[in-house]
Amino acid sequence: MKKRVAKFVRKCFLTHGKSTTNPSSIHSLIPVRSGDWDTAPAGTAQIDTVAHCGHTLAGDFIYTVNATDVPTLWGARRAQLNKGQTATVTSMEQMEKGVPFSIVEWHPDSGSEFINWHCKEWCENKGQQLTRSRPNHKNDNCFVEERNGHIVRRWIGYTRLDAMEVVAALNFVYDVLTPYLNHFVASRRTVSKERVGARWKVTREKRSKTPYERVLERSDVSETVKTKLRLEHETLNPLTMKREIDRRLQVVFSLQKHCGIPKLEK
């Protein structure tokens, strides 16, 4: 009798609880990207958001939507207030206009600003694929994650930006900063990486190249696009652009100082 009662008591205690949350159906419809990035065609863009929140996530603040084409490292970025679905798609539309070739795939992380029905339908209507990273795997989006730091954070910094007036001013900065980086700032890509003992041996390209040069080398980019880029490149002056970027950045921080929310900047 004692054994029967003990067995009954054990069954009263469940080994696991019941979940009251169902997985979002949108995640099952947007595929997780698999495969080698080295074989990706031009127009395969990783995309992410950078929060200009300062020391607190309280209240409204500005985000930068940052995108990087994986094969060419061609970048595009726009500023928006908060990261709502409509605002994010509007930023993606504007960034697409600044990319000289057609976008064939957008690859964000699992953030709700990108993984939603509005963004999915927008991509489908344009004939573009929307894929996503594995949750909690930041390295799946490594190209744009890297540029979140050494482009957005390096140029804009960590200051809180929360004034509506600053959105237009920050986009005014990106109007010059983006072509400056694409045409004149070179980088060396990693060719191989192997472990030797306790260290990693990293082999990089022998010569640094700008995104502009990488586009010209691509066989999957049309000659019409390349000719248009060459003509644009001839009209640009890096020294003049750098001075203009600095001037526009001063406007951004001046507007934030006068129009921002002081109590949230601390």
Predicted segment positions?
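Secondary-structure boundary/capping micro-motif
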Residues: 1-105, 110-266
